[in-house]
Amino acid sequence: SVDTRAPGKADDLEKSVNYGELCHFIQEFMEEHTYKLLEAVLENLAEAILQKWEKIEEITLEVKKPWAPIGLPLETVSVEITRGWHTAYIALGSNMGEKETYLRNAVKELDESAGCRVEKVSDFIATAPYGVTEQDEFLNGALKLRTLLTPEELLELLHEIEAKAERVRTLRWGPRTLDLDILFYDNL
């Protein structure tokens, strides 16, 4: 989906998506890439389009394969998907070592991850530990993220970033180099 009101009111192509460019992009993408599954074509094409055209919030694509080798008298087989950007809010925390460095590196890594765009980052604030109180204070913050990832994929990415920061999960509410939590994901 694209916001058509502003370009429609202004009659200004710069405020819209140039559908000619989009069609040529799709043609070139299909000519340059080979996939075994229709699903793979659609997943990769949708991500490429959404990454390239920021004005496109959501896209529905369908690929049809005529004369698919299924052994039945069908003219065509098709697969359709809808993919789009999601908004997530992530909490960041650290209470070991170079706390601010861990947090800034996590923000950078998220922003550089495929299908992720960090839109806003809060200030970092020092807070007292909860639960296990005999440990160093935490440095905490939050960020707003636009992502193409599902909640499960995003959680997996957060765990990978924590692992790179040598996060060890031994004690609930215990000390950690980096703690990343999904606070909100769209309206879930």
Please give the residue ranges for each predicted region:
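Core catalytic alpha/beta fold that binds nucleotide/phospho-ligands
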Residues: 31, 36, 57, 67-68, ...
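N-terminal, polar/charged subdomain of small-to-medium soluble alpha/beta proteins
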Residues: 1-88
